[in-house]
A protein has these predicted regions:
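Structured domain cores in non-transmembrane regions
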Residues: 58-107
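A structural signal for the main folded, soluble domain(s) of proteins
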Residues: 10-11
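N-terminal signal peptide c-region/cleavage motif recognized by signal peptidases
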Residues: 14-16
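Hydrophobic side chains in beta-strands
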Residues: 42, 55, 82, 117, ...
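Bacterial N-terminal signal peptides that target proteins for export
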Residues: 1-6
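N-terminal secretory signal peptides
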Residues: 20-79
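Low-complexity intrinsically disordered segments
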Residues: 20-22, 31, 86-151
């Protein structure tokens, strides 16, 4: 029984990919706690070596932000690029759609997610970033397309 609970917790808290913070800029001064900022992060597609995505999103500061209780705005931008060789023969076996990145955007209920689609006809990887909540999400989204191989 303990193993079942542990496995459930691991699945619940599993993260498809880890992002590396590239940098940030402050956009709103806060008297107490860190300033609100726009963060630029990079993560590699875990299933497609040679593709890296860069994502920018706002991070709320202040006292709530300092202790992890703030809710970040549900807006993000993404740009994915081929940064190395991609084995095009393996792309037809990819799950599509497939979540490749997820990050908490509030204490419990809100996440920013990146989902990858494989457009077989056009030989392109499409990455969609959006924010959702347990009850309702946001229609704000951004996509990036990485053309792969010969047609």
């Amino acid at each position: 029984m303990r193993r079942a609970w542990l496995a459930l917790l691991l699945v619940f808290f599993a993260v498809p990919a880890m992002a590396e913070e590239i940098g940030s800029v402050g956009y709103r001064f806060k008297w107490l706690g860190p300033n609100d900022k726009i963060v630029v992060e990079a993560f590699d597609d875990p299933d497609v070596p040679g593709v890296t995505c860069y994502m920018s999103h706002a991070r709320t500061g202040g006292l709530k932000g300092a202790v992890g209780l703030a809710e970040d705005p549900g807006e993000a931008s993404i740009a994915c690029r081929q940064v190395g060789p991609v084995d095009a023969s393996k792309l037809d076996k990819l799950r599509s759609p497939h979540e490749v990145f997820s990050e908490r955007a509030s204490f419990i209920f809100k996440t920013t997610q990146v989902t990858r689609f494989w457009d077989k006809k056009r030989r392109a990887l499409v990455y969609l970033v959006y924010t959702d909540r347990i009850i309702e999400g946001s229609p704000r989204n951004s996509i990036s397309v990485v053309p792969v191989g010969e047609r």
